[in-house]
């Protein structure tokens, strides 16, 4: 499903910096449209709507005691004026957003066709207004300045319940915010606590601070908001609004941080990096002459730089390597002069798999106690475990049974059914692809699949998956496969079992 928050977004908030002038507002939009095009980033231009007749009590409409009331009334624009500005936003190829401060403004935003609606921090506990905003069913961005975590939990629960597509912005409502007030670690908290929701950074720090946006990007923020405007001979910006030049530097800092952070996937290693490591490695050399057929035991070798071309390195050496020809003292051990044994290759593969499985469980934040058994299903042999099989943690097996299963990336479990067992899968992490009785279904975290006795099924994962199996009592030899070769195998040939992680029981 398409999400309006699928790309990183930059929000330029004009607020009242148009100063009540349509012409000045158009100039601001044009200048920041140039910034968006030059930096080639996806930008949103944001307005603020206030229906002053209903927002401000009639007895206070001319008050000078509250600086905001005076500011709002002195920069007031008509609806037609905002339409002109919105049309210019579209002409510049920018997306549009607006913050309502009253219910009537919500209707106006919806009628004018804005792309996004914004909840200001000061309105984030205004439940009559929040309910009205949720009923607009527009993509919603929620600022959280000054809110307690319980209040943010309430917001998340409410907008989830209403079915709104929304994002949260960590925000500090101090104008301007000093460095020691930014609390950027809140982004980490939000990312962990609200893992399925896009998280952003709504910033009021000084415009010359371009470090904060880089930190926010590195912590996983995907929306970035600043107040913007233009200085003129008559108009001076406040201390937390950016000029086009400052906004460009702000985005440059984001771009630089993006390059430094990478894409978050397993990184590829450039050839020059590999070369720089190779020339620092130690090669394996002989302490004394050695005859063909002897083994490279520790007393016969030493490790030293440089590592020569095609030479065995110290990390690959083991005492079971056999020499295929006679060699002299100080000779390098070249790979074409040795025979590396492949006995116990299957067990080595399983031990390698354990490391990857532990990492996947850690990534999924799944904690096991010290009392469990593990089971490798390797239907076509240990050597093919990474392609065909599954890893099982046996937790409980009584009248009921619980297992945790791990599918490594690209690993498939063959088609089979159970004679007695009824089971339900529930995905804890990643995605599980399943086929039951010929029907394919993709399971995401939290989703379940019931499999009754006699139902043919298979499963696999493209990127890796951890899922729970809750079932009736497990019985050995209860699985029937559609491959006769697997059915004909003894259980001990297609299963390797161990206590805990198999320490000292799965041998090299």
Segments the model singles out, each with a brief description of its role:
Residues 293, 330, 408-411, 446-448, ...:
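Tight coil/turn sites that cap or link beta-strands
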Residues 408-409, 419-437:
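Glycine- and acidic-residue-biased ligand/ion/polar-headgroup-sensing regions
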Residues 424, 438-456:
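Short acidic-glycine-tyrosine-enriched beta hairpin
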Residues 1-351:
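Catalytic cores and adjacent flexible loops of soluble metabolic enzymes
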Residues 386-388, 403-419:
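Conserved short histidine dyad/triad with adjacent acidic residue
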Residues 462-508:
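Double-stranded beta-helix
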Residues 343-400, 492-508:
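A short, N-terminal "cap"/entry segment at the start of jelly-roll beta-barrel domains
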């Amino acid at each position: 499903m398409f999400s309006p928050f699928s790309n990183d977004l930059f929000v330029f908030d004009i607020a009242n910096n148009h100063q009540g002038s349509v012409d000045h507002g158009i100039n601001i939009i044009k200048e920041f449209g140039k910034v968006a095009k030059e930096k080639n980033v996806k930008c949103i231009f944001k307005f603020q709507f206030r229906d002053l007749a209903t927002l401000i009590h009639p007895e206070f409409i001319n008050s000078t005691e509250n600086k905001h009331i005076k500011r709002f009334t002195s920069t007031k624009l008509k609806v037609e004026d905002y339409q002109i500005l919105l049309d210019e936003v579209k002409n510049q190829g920018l997306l549009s957003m607006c913050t309502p401060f009253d219910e009537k403004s919500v209707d106006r935003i919806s009628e004018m066709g804005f792309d996004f609606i914004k909840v200001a921090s000061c309105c984030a506990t205004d439940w009559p207004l929040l309910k009205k905003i949720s009923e607009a069913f527009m993509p919603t961005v929620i600022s959280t300045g000054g809110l307690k975590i319980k209040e943010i939990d309430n917001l998340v629960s409410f907008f989830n319940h209403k079915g709104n597509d929304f994002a949260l912005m960590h925000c500090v409502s101090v104008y301007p915010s000093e460095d020691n007030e930014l609390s950027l670690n809140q982004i980490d908290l939000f990312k962990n606590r609200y893992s399925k929701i896009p998280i952003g950074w709504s910033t009021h720090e000084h415009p010359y601070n371009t470090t904060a946006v880089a930190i926010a990007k590195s912590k996983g923020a995907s929306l970035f908001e600043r107040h913007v405007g233009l200085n003129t001979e008559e108009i001076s910006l406040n201390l937390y609004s950016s000029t086009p030049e400052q906004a460009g530097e702000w985005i440059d800092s984001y771009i630089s941080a993006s390059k430094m952070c990478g894409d978050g996937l397993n990184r590829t290693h450039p050839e020059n990096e590999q070369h720089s490591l190779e020339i620092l490695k130690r090669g394996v050399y002989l302490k004394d002459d050695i005859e063909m057929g002897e083994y490279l035991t520790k007393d016969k070798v030493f490790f030293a730089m440089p590592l020569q071309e095609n030479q065995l390195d110290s990390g690959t050496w083991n005492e079971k390597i056999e020499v295929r020809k006679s060699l002299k003292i100080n000779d390098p051990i070249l790979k074409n002069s040795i025979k590396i044994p492949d006995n116990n290759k299957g067990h080595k593969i399983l031990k390698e798999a354990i490391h990857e499985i532990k990492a996947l469980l850690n990534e999924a934040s799944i904690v096991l106690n010290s009392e469990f058994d593990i089971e490798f299903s390797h239907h076509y042999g240990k050597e093919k475990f990474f392609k065909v099989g599954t890893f099982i943690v046996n937790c409980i097996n009584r009248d009921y049974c619980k297992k945790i299963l791990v599918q490594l990336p690209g690993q498939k479990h063959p088609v089979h059914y159970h004679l007695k067992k009824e089971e339900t899968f529930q995905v804890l992490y990643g995605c599980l692809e399943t086929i039951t009785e010929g029907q394919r279904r993709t399971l995401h975290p939290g989703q379940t699949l019931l499999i009754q006795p006699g139902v043919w099924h298979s499963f696999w994962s493209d990127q890796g998956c951890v899922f729970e199996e809750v079932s009736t009592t497990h019985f050995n030899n209860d699985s029937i496969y559609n491959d006769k070769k697997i059915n004909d195998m003894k259980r001990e040939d297609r299963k390797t079992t161990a206590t805990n992680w198999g320490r000292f029981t799965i041998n090299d």
